[in-house]
């Protein structure tokens, strides 16, 4: 039986305050409990959705670091975490709020099943904020079996400011979500 929701994420970090502040800003969360070594935050009725642990110095995580003179490669571990918004308006309002705080996505893409914006937190972890492009999971799954998805399973990049402009101009959401 599958889970019914994402319960929480826990990050071990050397920058607890910076990580906490970043996630609280991005998710509209607030701290439930915090001490010198840990912080718990939530954005809904769950006791905590995101937690941060600081139990002492960790080796810095630098995506650009090299070892033995070779180009770095992805290492095992968390690739990204995704959070879904309930509507295009909420999704884009959140983008504008974050943009105005100086938090900008590094990759914006219409995957087909979702329209997504990818961010990096202060430790370099990837965070995907998304909306579903279909009314039901079945419709999204069916689209993933289409020739269009087979030709390009990653998706089509978009400019988030242009998407905001089109949305505010009254372009129907269904039209904004279309991906060839």
Give residue spans per PLM region:
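N-terminal "first-domain core" detector
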Residues: 6-44
């Amino acid at each position: 039986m599958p889970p019914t929701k994402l319960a929480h994420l826990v990050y071990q970090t050397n920058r607890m305050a910076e990580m906490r502040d970043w996630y609280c800003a991005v998710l509209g969360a607030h701290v439930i409990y915090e001490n010198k070594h840990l912080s718990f935050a939530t954005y809904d009725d769950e006791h905590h959705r995101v937690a941060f642990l600081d139990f002492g110095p960790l080796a810095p995580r630098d995506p650009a670091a090299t070892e033995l003179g070779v180009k770095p490669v992805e290492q095992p571990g968390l690739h990204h975490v995704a959070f879904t918004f309930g509507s295009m308006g909420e999704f884009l309002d959140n983008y504008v709020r974050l943009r105005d705080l100086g938090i900008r996505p590094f990759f914006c893409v219409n995957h087909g099943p979702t329209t997504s914006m990818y961010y990096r937190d202060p430790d370099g972890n990837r965070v995907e904020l998304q909306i579903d492009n279909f009314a039901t999971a079945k419709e999204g799954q069916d689209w993933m079996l289409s020739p269009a998805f087979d030709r390009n399973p990653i998706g089509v990049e978009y400019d988030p400011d242009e998407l905001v402009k089109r949305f505010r101009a009254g372009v129907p959401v269904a039209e904004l979500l279309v991906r060839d």
